[in-house]
Swiss-Prot record:
Keywords: Amino-acid biosynthesis, Aromatic amino acid biosynthesis, ATP-binding, Cytoplasm, Kinase, Magnesium, Metal-binding, Nucleotide-binding, Transferase. The gene is aroK. GO terms for biological process: amino acid biosynthetic process; aromatic amino acid family biosynthetic process; chorismate biosynthetic process. This is Shikimate kinase. Binds 1 Mg(2+) ion per subunit.
């Protein structure tokens, strides 16, 4: 049976998953988790260091372990890494264990939000825009297929996104807030 009390945020880097996730968890009295931060906590090193020493495959393996663990929790909001949806096992855990929200935004908005962040290994390239466009081309169909709801964070504030998520979910017949 699907656990509709967890909320999992998916989407590209810079879409606001961590920011919206923290606000959403606070509004709902739920626990917030960020899969990338949990990977760093468990390994004691940064995501860029994992990419450097283990490559993307090593990082994705660690990410799958963390997602399997975290999605087994109750009443959490989880901000996932942008590429977490690439692994079938991650998609299965997310779909079966909670409500999946796709936070989407334009490549331009992603660039504005991430251009100074050196902790984005996939953007350490000569042409970050082209890289983001490539990632979106591959991942957007996966995000859309997996998502229960899609919320555009490029045109609205984080607080507005939180309100839209809560309203959409409550219209589906389940109350999220703890009274």
């Amino acid at each position: 049976m699907r656990n509709r009390r967890n909320i999992f945020l998916i989407g590209p880097m810079g879409a606001g998953k961590t920011t919206v996730g923290r606000l959403l968890a606070r509004a709902l009295g739920m626990e917030f988790w960020d899969s990338d931060k949990e990977i760093e906590r468990r390994t004691g090193v940064t995501v860029p260091m994992i990419f450097e020493y283990e490559g993307e495959a090593g990082f994705r393996r660690r990410e799958s372990e963390v997602i399997a663990d975290l999605t087994g929790k109750e009443r959490i909001v989880l901000a996932t890494g942008g590429g977490s949806v690439l692994a079938a096992e991650n998609r299965e855990h997310l779909a079966a264990r909670g409500l999946v929200i796709y936070l989407q935004c334009s490549v331009q908005k992603q660039l504005e939000r991430t251009h100074k962040d050196m902790n984005r290994p996939l953007l350490q390239t000569e042409n970050p825009r082209q890289r983001l466009e490539e990632l979106l081309r591959v991942r957007d169909p996966i995000y859309r297929e997996l998502a229960d709801y899609v919320v555009d964070t490029g045109q609205h504030s984080s607080r507005s996104a939180v309100r839209r998520i809560i309203n959409a979910y409550e219209k589906s017949g389940t109350r999220l807030r703890t009274e």
